[in-house]
Every structure is written in structure tokens, then in C-alpha cells.
Amino acid sequence: MDLFEYQAKELFAKHNVPTTPGRVTDTAEGARAIATEIGHPVMVKAQVKIGGRGKAGGVKYAATPDDAYEHANNILGLDIKGHVVKKLLVAEASDIAEEYYISFLLDRANRTYLAMCSVEGGMEIEEVAATKPDRLAKVPVDAAKGVDLAFARSIAEQGHLPAEVLDAAAVTISKLWDLFVGEDATLVEVNPLVRTPDDQILALDGKVTLDANADFRHPDHVEFEDRAATDPLELKAKEHDLNYVKLDGQVGIIGNGAGLVMSTLDVVAYAGEKHGGVKPANFLDIGGGASAEVMAAGLDVVLGDSQVKSVFVNVFGGITSCDAVATGIVKALEILGAEANKPLVVRLDGNNVEEGRRILTDANHPLVTLVPTMDEAADKAAELASA
């Protein structure tokens, strides 16, 4: 889960990472009030989960509260690379002597953690890596040893930070590591990390990505979810622990196992070419347990999409046998009742497939069409969606 800058700074404050005071608002009047409260010039910053805010006019310096009001009026509603600005961070402006870069991230290729540090802060790190690779240090981090002050100082040295800031930078770097580990993050980035004229080290901008798989350890992380920007069907699926991604199509997809569901998307897209360009409407993996409750929840989510014209249920029975899946489908249709109002094409294969097919045949539900092969089922689902 990617965080907004203001949320990242809330975690900075929690872990004692020094930054500038500020608050978030969604109105221009709120921006003026915050600037008045701070009592110094401020930065008015668009809160979007995308880079390039400054170039798009989403970050402005305000010398007075009235300036903050004017800038906020101009920034709210601004479209930055497809992201509409709905919130602003109004933070105290800081004098800057130098700008640096520091981040911790997962190095998936080498199965370790990585610290990245550079004296060339305030610019895109990809640009630094491309044009000045010798100025960007990439330091592997042993998770068992962590990042103490001595190692943090070494990271700063390798990033070519000046000698006079090494001790202060080391303290901040070690705290950023504590945040990275303590919050189960996959990325913690500060760009720029600045030195002020009086030699303070401040994190002026922050980016944090949290590992959603660790949410069970962090019930407070639910506060960071941007529910207003999340598709309501995806929210409903998450409540039932279903892996759902909405797509722009007409054939709802329900399957067990990510690989099978991905293959189902492909065969439906291929079949749809013969039926007016019909496409998959979603990715939905119900996992290994296709109980009646899970199947009902999955159907409820898929049928809640007004674009869906038909549903393709594609299940390979393994640990969960096909008869259990078939029973789940029948009971799910009973649970949903009139809400289940679109045709279902069902393909079963694998463990106890004959019994599963018998259960669906005996149920004789008017919405259910049982098809033996994946290709035939995809074609039938596409045909029904195009009707």
C-alpha cells in the first residue's frame, strides 16, 4: 500500500524522524488557517501518489496565509498524470543548504534489503543512477544485524555526504531503518533529506510503501487506506479476503488459484474477439476454499459490477474437490436469490469432477450452463455477454 506524503510523515513523527511541522486539508480556507497557525512561510503540496508534482504545478511556496489560500485554490482539483488532487499538505517552509537522498527497499533480485544513499538529492533518483552512478551508493543490509549508528554512518559516507553532517545523518538513517522494519514497509524513501543553514537534518519529502501481507500485525494501518479512491467492489472483496481486481470488460471471472485465473483472462479475451470485442471484467481468485460462503461472496462482488453481462466460474478441484465447489455454487445461488440475475458458465475439472458435475446438473438452475472444457466455456461466456 502506497502512502500519501502526509501519511508517510505521520510515520516519520512516530519514529522520531525529524521533519517540518504541517497538517493536511482539503480546502483553501483550511490551507490559510494552517499557514496562519504555523506563523512562517509554508509549502502547499498536492497529495497524490505519483511523482512530478512540482513540474505539474502541485507544489508552491507561500509567503503569507493569503498566498497559501490562493495556491490551494489553484492546486485542488488539479489533474497530475491522471491523479486528481483532493488533499493538500501545508508544511512549514525550510531554508536549504544541501539536498541528499536516502531510501531503504527490498532487493528482490538478491533476496535482501538495500540502502540507497546519494549526495545528489532533490532530483529523480533514476536520473542520478543514469547520469551519475558513482554518486549513488547501493548498500546491502543484513536484516539480522540491522542498521546501528556505525553502519548508518557508513551508508552516509558511501553516499558521499559531507563529513560535517555524517553524525546527524546517521541518526536519521538509523531511525528510518527502524520505521522500515517496525512498520513492515517495502520502501521508505526521503528525497530530499536536507541540511539547513544551521546544520539540522530534515526529511522534507517522504515516500512509504507498506506490505499489505503484514496488515495483521498493524491494525492501525487501516487508517492509511484511501477508501475514497478505491473501487467499492475492491473494498467489498477485501472485506471477504478475496483477491479481486476490477477490469474494463463484460465477462466476470471467478477461479481458484492466481495462475488459473490469469489463464482464464487470456482465453476469455481471445474468445471475445469473435463476439464483438468482449473482454474480462475482473480478476477474482477465491483461493483454495470454495465454500458456499466464499462462492456467494465472490458472486456478490462480480455481479455488483454493472458492466458484467455473464460470469465464467472456472475451478480446478485439488485439495478442495469439485463436488464441494459445485455444492458451494448451488448454495451461493440460494443465498443470493434474486441478486443472482446474470448467466453463469461453469467449468469444473480435477478431483471428484464427475460428482461435481452431477450436483450442478441435478440442481438444474436456469442461470447455470455447465461446459466441459475451458475453451468452450470461455466461448460460451463471451457469447452470452455479447447477446
UniProtKB/Swiss-Prot annotation:
<feature type="binding site">
    <location>
        <position position="191"/>
    </location>
    <ligand>
        <name>Mg(2+)</name>
    </ligand>
</feature>
<dbReference type="Pfam" id="PF08442">
    <property type="entry name" value="ATP-grasp_2"/>
</dbReference>
<keyword id="KW-0479">Metal-binding</keyword>
<dbReference type="InterPro" id="IPR005809">
    <property type="entry name" value="Succ_CoA_ligase-like_bsu"/>
</dbReference>
<dbReference type="GO" id="GO:0042709">
    <property type="term" value="C:succinate-CoA ligase complex"/>
</dbReference>
<comment type="similarity">
    <text>Belongs to the succinate/malate CoA ligase beta subunit family.</text>
</comment>
<feature type="binding site">
    <location>
        <position position="45"/>
    </location>
    <ligand>
        <name>ATP</name>
    </ligand>
</feature>
<feature type="binding site">
    <location>
        <begin position="318"/>
        <end position="320"/>
    </location>
    <ligand>
        <name>substrate</name>
    </ligand>
</feature>
<keyword id="KW-0067">ATP-binding</keyword>
<dbReference type="InterPro" id="IPR013650">
    <property type="entry name" value="ATP-grasp_succ-CoA_synth-type"/>
</dbReference>
<dbReference type="GO" id="GO:0000287">
    <property type="term" value="F:magnesium ion binding"/>
</dbReference>
<comment type="function">
    <text>Succinyl-CoA synthetase functions in the citric acid cycle (TCA), coupling the hydrolysis of succinyl-CoA to the synthesis of either ATP or GTP and thus represents the only step of substrate-level phosphorylation in the TCA. The beta subunit provides nucleotide specificity of the enzyme and binds the substrate succinate, while the binding sites for coenzyme A and phosphate are found in the alpha subunit.</text>
</comment>
<feature type="binding site">
    <location>
        <position position="256"/>
    </location>
    <ligand>
        <name>substrate</name>
    </ligand>
</feature>
<dbReference type="GO" id="GO:0004775">
    <property type="term" value="F:succinate-CoA ligase (ADP-forming) activity"/>
</dbReference>
<dbReference type="InterPro" id="IPR013815">
    <property type="entry name" value="ATP_grasp_subdomain_1"/>
</dbReference>
<dbReference type="InterPro" id="IPR016102">
    <property type="entry name" value="Succinyl-CoA_synth-like"/>
</dbReference>
<keyword id="KW-0547">Nucleotide-binding</keyword>
<dbReference type="GO" id="GO:0005524">
    <property type="term" value="F:ATP binding"/>
</dbReference>
<feature type="binding site">
    <location>
        <position position="205"/>
    </location>
    <ligand>
        <name>Mg(2+)</name>
    </ligand>
</feature>
<dbReference type="InterPro" id="IPR011761">
    <property type="entry name" value="ATP-grasp"/>
</dbReference>
<dbReference type="GO" id="GO:0005829">
    <property type="term" value="C:cytosol"/>
</dbReference>
<keyword id="KW-0816">Tricarboxylic acid cycle</keyword>
<feature type="binding site">
    <location>
        <position position="99"/>
    </location>
    <ligand>
        <name>ATP</name>
    </ligand>
</feature>
<comment type="subunit">
    <text>Heterotetramer of two alpha and two beta subunits.</text>
</comment>
<dbReference type="InterPro" id="IPR005811">
    <property type="entry name" value="SUCC_ACL_C"/>
</dbReference>
<dbReference type="GO" id="GO:0006099">
    <property type="term" value="P:tricarboxylic acid cycle"/>
</dbReference>
<dbReference type="GO" id="GO:0004776">
    <property type="term" value="F:succinate-CoA ligase (GDP-forming) activity"/>
</dbReference>
<feature type="domain" description="ATP-grasp">
    <location>
        <begin position="9"/>
        <end position="236"/>
    </location>
</feature>
<comment type="pathway">
    <text>Carbohydrate metabolism; tricarboxylic acid cycle; succinate from succinyl-CoA (ligase route): step 1/1.</text>
</comment>
<dbReference type="GO" id="GO:0006104">
    <property type="term" value="P:succinyl-CoA metabolic process"/>
</dbReference>
<feature type="binding site">
    <location>
        <position position="94"/>
    </location>
    <ligand>
        <name>ATP</name>
    </ligand>
</feature>
<keyword id="KW-0460">Magnesium</keyword>
<dbReference type="Pfam" id="PF00549">
    <property type="entry name" value="Ligase_CoA"/>
</dbReference>
<keyword id="KW-0436">Ligase</keyword>
<feature type="binding site">
    <location>
        <begin position="52"/>
        <end position="54"/>
    </location>
    <ligand>
        <name>ATP</name>
    </ligand>
</feature>
<dbReference type="InterPro" id="IPR017866">
    <property type="entry name" value="Succ-CoA_synthase_bsu_CS"/>
</dbReference>
<protein>
    <recommendedName>
        <fullName>Succinate--CoA ligase [ADP-forming] subunit beta</fullName>
        <ecNumber>6.2.1.5</ecNumber>
    </recommendedName>
</protein>
